[in-house]
């Protein structure tokens, strides 16, 4: 991430300068942007845990603009979303593809949103292997296990059958925000922030 904007806030004690992400965190907004890897996941998990410690009853907003990424990194975010007490609402801004779409669907029921011109894409896990045949078999079995796990969670989150999810994730399956709502990955397409 290149340039990070700063905002200045006037308080009783004078002016205070924040980077924009710290300011958003004050409002319980976490931004998941770009490829999901271990570093990004650790940052998201830390922010979720921090916000739970600040107020375990108040919702957290997870804004997603991501092409996806590493499955285990994404699953660490998913597990933390389920582990913490506050509801995590998810909002797609731009795109939620692959693991990004998976996490979008994992928001609290009734609190999964997308902006109108965002795109959502689901597909099966990607992976590669090299080495001895037995090593390739081990990796292949693990990818198939993760595929089954993610399809099962997507089916539960969307209300689609496991068979339908398996069919749709066999290749890249793109949806508009409206189509993602009809599919069950989100609950509402947001036109205006009513805060």
UniProtKB/Swiss-Prot annotation:
Subcellular location: Cytoplasm
Keywords: Cytoplasm, Hydrolase, Protease, Serine protease
Catalyzed chemical reaction(s): Hydrolysis of proteins to small peptides in the presence of ATP and magnesium. alpha-casein is the usual test substrate. In the absence of ATP, only oligopeptides shorter than five residues are hydrolyzed (such as succinyl-Leu-Tyr-|-NHMec, and Leu-Tyr-Leu-|-Tyr-Trp, in which cleavage of the -Tyr-|-Leu- and -Tyr-|-Trp bonds also occurs)
Enzyme active site: 98 (nucleophile), 123
Domain of life: Bacteria
One protein family per Pfam: CLP_protease
GO biological process: protein quality control for misfolded or incompletely synthesized proteins
Entry GO CC: cytoplasm; endopeptidase Clp complex
InterPro entries: ClpP, ClpP/crotonase-like_dom_sf, ClpP/TepA, ClpP_His_AS, ClpP_Ser_AS
PROSITE patterns according to UniProt: CLP_PROTEASE_HIS, CLP_PROTEASE_SER
Molecular function per GO: ATP-dependent peptidase activity; ATPase binding; serine-type endopeptidase activity
EC nos: 3.4.21.92
Main EC class the enzyme belongs to: hydrolase
Stated role: Cleaves peptides in various proteins in a process that requires ATP hydrolysis. Has a chymotrypsin-like activity. Plays a major role in the degradation of misfolded proteins.
Listed name of the protein: ATP-dependent Clp protease proteolytic subunit
Organism: Helicobacter pylori (strain Shi470)
């Amino acid at each position: 991430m290149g340039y990070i904007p700063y905002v200045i806030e006037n308080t009783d004690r004078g002016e205070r300068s924040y980077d924009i992400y710290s300011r958003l965190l004050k409002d319980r907004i976490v931004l998941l942007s770009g490829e999901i890897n271990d570093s990004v996941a650790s940052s998201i998990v830390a922010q979720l845990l921090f916000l739970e410690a600040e107020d375990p009853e108040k919702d957290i907003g997870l804004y997603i603009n991501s092409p996806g990424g590493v499955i285990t990194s994404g699953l660490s975010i998913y597990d933390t979303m389920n582990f913490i007490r506050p509801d995590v609402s998810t909002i797609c801004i731009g795109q939620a593809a692959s693991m990004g779409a998976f996490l979008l669907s994992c928001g609290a029921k009734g609190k999964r949103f997308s902006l109108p011109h965002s795109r959502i894409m689901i597909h099966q896990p990607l992976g590669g292997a090299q080495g001895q045949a037995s090593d390739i078999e081990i990796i292949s079995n693990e990818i198939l296990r993760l595929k089954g796990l993610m399809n099962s969670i997507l089916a539960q989150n969307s209300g689609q059958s496991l068979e339908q999810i398996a069919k749709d994730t066999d290749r890249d399956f793109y949806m508009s925000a409206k189509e993602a709502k009809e599919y069950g990955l989100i609950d509402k397409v947001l036109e205006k922030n009513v805060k």
